[in-house]
Amino acid sequence: MPRPVAAATAAENAVITKATLRAADLLEITARTLALVIGVSEATVSRMRKQEFLLERGTKPFELAVLFVRLFRSLDA
């Protein structure tokens, strides 16, 4: 059985991954450009879309994705 902290971290990883993809879609940003923005490969973005890969807290791509989502939110306000 997963520990509550581990479950919360997994949920946070899923939320940031989904929010990043949604923001990119709404801003009409291609997978190639998103990959450059968050510092992953285009194949990784494809795996993110298929829910086969989640951004992990504490990694550089996760932090860049958080900034990207914040940027989207400020533009959308």
Task: Give residue spans per PLM region.
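Non-transmembrane "mature" sequence context
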Residues: 1-77
